[in-house]
Amino acid sequence: MKRLFTFLMLQTLVLALWAQTCRTASCCHSESPSQWTGTWATAVEYTGQGDMPRHSLASTTLRQVVRVSMAGNENLSNCPTTLRLQLSNEFSDAPVEIRCVYIANALDSSDIQAGSARYLTFKGQRAVTIAAGATVWSDELTTFPLKALSRVAITVSYGKNVPTHATSHRGSRTTSYIASGKVGPQQKFSTIEKVDHWYNIAKLEVRSLATAIAVLGNSITDGRGSTTNQQDRWTDFLATALNRQQPVGVLNLGIGGNCVVEGGLSQPALQRFDRDILGQHHATRLILFEGTNDIGLCPKGQSEQVVDRLISAYVQLIDKAHAAGMTVYLATITPFKGNGWYTPFHEAARQEVNKWIRTSGKADVVIDFDRLVRDPANPDRLRPNYSDDWLHLNPTGYEAMGEYAASLLLNNL
C-alpha cells in the first residue's frame, strides 16, 4: 500500500511538472508580444576608402559586437527572446553576397559563447544576396538567450561578390574582427584585421510590449571621446539608467560630423530623418540633439542665417515627429570654446538657437545639456573634467548627460 501511494504521488508530481512545462511552452508560443521594437540600431552611411578594411571583405568572416538595450519578452521570464536583424546595402552600388549570419553572446575580444550561437535565415535560407540600395530582414529567431544591456556578436560570412564600398557606420566605438574564409561558431576565429567600424548591420529588433527612444545626433551622440569597447557613450548611460526602471529600447542614430541642414558628413538630418527616425518600429519618443556642426562650419559673419536655417529645420523635424505620434525632446547645443572653430560669431549663433529651444515651446520637453555641462566660471566652455578636446565629452561628461536625460524621460512618461 505504501509503495502504491508513493507511486501515485510521483506520478502526480510528474504530471504537474509536465503540465507546467506545456503551459510555459504554450505561453512562449501563444502570448509572445506581436510588436517589433528596436533594441539596437545604427545610422548607416556611405563608406569612403579610408574607412574600408585593408583586406577585401570578399570570402571573409566579419564579427561585429553591439550592445543591446532591452531584451524583449519582458513579461515571459522563462522564454527566450524572439528577434530579427536588418542588414543594409543602401549606400553601395553593387550587390553584397552573404553566405551566412549567426548571432551569439559576446565574450572578450573576438570570442563568443559558442553554445549561445544561433544561425539566422532569410526566407528560410542561410545565404542571402542584398541588391544595391536595398535592405533585408532576417526571419524571426525565437530561441536566442538575450539579456538586457548585454553585448552580442553578429558574425557575417561574405561570399566572393561584395561592393568596393560597403554600407557601414564609421563610428562604431567597438572593434570588429575579420578572419579569412568561412568561420563557424565552434571554430577558432583567427583574426587577420581589426577595424573600429560596422558593416552592413543596421537594426536588431525584439518582440516586446515596450517602446523605443530614437536619438538623432552628431559625433557627441555617436560617442566621440568615449572609450572604445567600453560602451560609455551618453546613450549607453541613458539605456542603463532607463532599463534599471523598466524595459525600453534606446536607439543611437548619431553620425560623426553630421549636420542638420546641409554639409558635414553623410546625409544631413533633414534628409535621413524618415529612414533613421520614422523608420524605427514603435519608437514613440525622439531626442533631437544636433546643430553644433551647422554652427561650427558656417562662415564668419553668417550667424543670423545659420540660426534661421537651424530653427526652420527643427520645426520641420518636430512637426514630422509629432505627426508620427512621437513625443519630442529637444536638446540645447553644448559649448565649444577652446575648440578650433570657436569665434564670437559662432557663439552668438549658439546662444540664439539655445534661446529658441528653451522658450519656443515647440518641443514637448527641453533637455538642457548646455546648462548641465558648461563650466559655471566660463559658460561658453565645457567643464574641464567633462571634456578632453573642448568639443566632445569624455566618459565622465557622457555619464552626467545620460543620467540627466534619463531623469527627464522617467519624469515625463
Model regions and ranges:
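Bacterial Sec-dependent N-terminal signal peptides
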Residues: 1-30
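Surface-exposed amphipathic alpha-helices with a cationic face
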Residues: 314-322
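Catalytic His-Asp segment of secreted/periplasmic serine-dependent ester chemistry enzymes
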Residues: 296, 333-413
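Surface-exposed acidic, glycine-flexible loop patches that form ligand/cofactor-binding
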Residues: 144-145, 275-282, 319-320, 411-413
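N-terminal secretory targeting modules
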Residues: 20-216, 226-228
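Conserved SGNH/GDSL esterase-like catalytic core that processes O-acyl groups on lipids
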Residues: 40, 104-110, 180-204, 209-315, ...
